[in-house]
């Protein structure tokens, strides 16, 4: 394996017309992340010193989505799409003689660092490392031509003879070569072929005619080199990828009720004896402690969940923290900035945002708690609302320990309710409540004399 610096070229200029979308093909998501982001992340994990992104169709949108997250990218425009060789030619002024150059594709998202490390290690001095795969049905792919067992060239499907079309080893397009060599070969490319395009694959024959060795390497899994040209292929690749992730988690001790009905769209850390029911989606950065139970249909995004937490079905949690032994749902929602301390409970149809629920506190039913600091051992009655927005600004509600808030109460912020206070059902709180105080603001109940119920007109 070479000790030289590694430069990675990512080809991402294709329009993707078969996606039938205004979104550039490489920006379509797989497992919650744009396909091209998977490729860039892999290149970064390889320790690439420079990454050149060749873009074309939808370039402004591509730069808008990626430039901030991937500041070191070198953006290279391919104004006219004339083949893979032409795409890499656009980087000629960027490539250095003393580095190795690895070619990747923005629509081949699942290529792994392990496979690429093997490819880099296999590149012979002065030659090419080429990633190939053997398919039962190689229709549509460029075939690997061998002479005396050695790779001698690649012939594209449309240029292949009937005999060559019987070859089952195909080109993935992924290769690595020295900068000085690949620059020379790129300068020799022509478009004298059935497509009238500049094929990157032609450099294989050039290397062979120079007496250079081409070492072929195959990926660990075939899914690593599957490309995406339409939504059907993307959906199939998504399910294959999710199945692989589910199997990995099962082998690591996570209980998945059905591995075919689980989606992981980010990074997942977990403790022991975690149990996840069907149709659960984990997004972003998710951390689950020991013995966490997640019911069917839940969505967790960028969350930290403590030990022994039970999350009942159809609960949605985003950018929040839940401490040990808390319970949520069913149908609860924690929006960004929410936090539950130990042994807290958020029940059905309770929504929290920028709010903290203290140790042992409970909000069991049908409540909205926004911009609120709630102490320990507080009971929030059904239908309670913290009225945090005055039409222009948000305001805080502070609730001390051991407070009891009766059902159907409105707490108009900014307001503070002291420790041990009791709020009667149906009360609208507009002023601070002292410690231990009992308040009630609903009108006195009285009967209406001589009242009769209306009767429907016939």
Swiss-Prot record:
Pfam families: Hexapep, NTP_transf_3. One of its GO terms (biological process) is lipid A biosynthetic process. UDP-N-acetyl-alpha-D-glucosamine binds at residues 11-14, 25, 78, 83-84, 105-107, 142, 156, 171, 229, 335, 353, 368, 379. Residues 253-458 are annotated as: N-acetyltransferase. Mg(2+) binds at residues 107, 229. Residues 1-231 are annotated as: Pyrophosphorylase. Residues 232-252 are annotated as: Linker. GO terms for molecular function: glucosamine-1-phosphate N-acetyltransferase activity; magnesium ion binding; UDP-N-acetylglucosamine diphosphorylase activity. It is found in: Cytoplasm. GO terms for cellular component: cytoplasm; membrane. It comes from the Bacteria. Homotrimer. Catalyzes the last two sequential reactions in the de novo biosynthetic pathway for UDP-N-acetylglucosamine (UDP-GlcNAc). The C-terminal domain catalyzes the transfer of acetyl group from acetyl coenzyme A to glucosamine-1-phosphate (GlcN-1-P) to produce N-acetylglucosamine-1-phosphate (GlcNAc-1-P), which is converted into UDP-GlcNAc by the transfer of uridine 5-monophosphate (from uridine 5-triphosphate), a reaction catalyzed by the N-terminal domain. This is Bifunctional protein GlmU. It comes from Sodalis glossinidius (strain morsitans). The gene is glmU.
């Amino acid at each position: 394996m070479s000790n030289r610096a590694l430069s990675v070229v990512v080809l991402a200029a294709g329009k993707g017309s078969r996606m039938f979308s205004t979104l550039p093909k490489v920006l379509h998501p797989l497992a919650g992340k744009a396909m091209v982001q998977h490729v860039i992340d892999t290149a970064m994990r390889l320790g690439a010193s420079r990454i050149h992104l060749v873009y074309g169709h939808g370039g402004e949108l591509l730069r808008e989505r990626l430039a901030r997250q991937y500041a070191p990218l070198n953006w290279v425009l391919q104004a006219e799409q004339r083949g893979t060789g032409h795409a890499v030619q656009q980087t000629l002024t960027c490539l250095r003689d003393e580095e190795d150059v690895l070619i990747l594709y923005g629509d081949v998202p699942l290529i792994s660092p392990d496979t690429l490390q093997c490819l880099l290690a296999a590149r012979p001095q002065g030659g090419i490392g080429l990633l190939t795969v053997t398919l039962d049905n190689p229709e549509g792919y460029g075939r690997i031509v061998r002479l005396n067992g050695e790779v001698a060239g690649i012939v594209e499907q449309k240029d292949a003879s009937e005999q060559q079309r019987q070859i089952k080893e195909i080109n993935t397009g992924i290769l690595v070569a020295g900068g000085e060599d690949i620059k020379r070969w790129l300068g020799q490319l022509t478009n004298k072929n059935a497509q009238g395009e500049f094929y990157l694959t032609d450099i294989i024959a050039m290397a062979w005619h120079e007496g250079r060795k081409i070492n072929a390497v195959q990926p660990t899994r075939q899914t690593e080199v599957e490309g995406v040209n339409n939504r059907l292929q993307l959906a199939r690749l998504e399910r294959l990828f999710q199945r692989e992730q589910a199997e990995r988690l099962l082998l690591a001790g996570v209980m998945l009720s059905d591995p075919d009905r689980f989606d992981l769209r980010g990074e997942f850390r977990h403790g022991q004896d975690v149990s996840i029911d069907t149709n659960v989606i984990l997004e972003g950065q998710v951390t689950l402690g020991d013995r966490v139970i997640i019911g069917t249909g839940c969505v967790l995004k960028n969350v930290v969940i403590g030990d022994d937490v039970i999350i009942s079905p159809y609960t949605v949690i985003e950018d929040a923290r839940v401490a040990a032994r808390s319970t949520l749902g069913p149908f609860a929602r924690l929006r960004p900035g929410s936090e539950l301390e130990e042994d807290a409970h958020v029940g059905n149809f309770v929504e929290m945002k920028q709010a903290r629920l203290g140790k042992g506190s409970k909000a069991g039913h049908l409540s909205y708690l926004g911009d609120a600091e709630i102490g320990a051992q507080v009971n929030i009655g059904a239908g309670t609302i913290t009225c945090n927005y005055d039409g222009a600004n948000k305001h805080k509600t502070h609730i001390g320990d051991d407070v009891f808030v009766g059902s159907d109460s409105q707490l108009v912020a900014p307001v503070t309710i002291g420790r041990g206070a009791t709020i009667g059902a149906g009360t609208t709180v507009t002023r601070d409540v002292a410690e231990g105080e009992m308040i009630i603001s609903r009108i006195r109940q009285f009967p209406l004399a001589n009242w009769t119920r209306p009767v429907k007109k016939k």
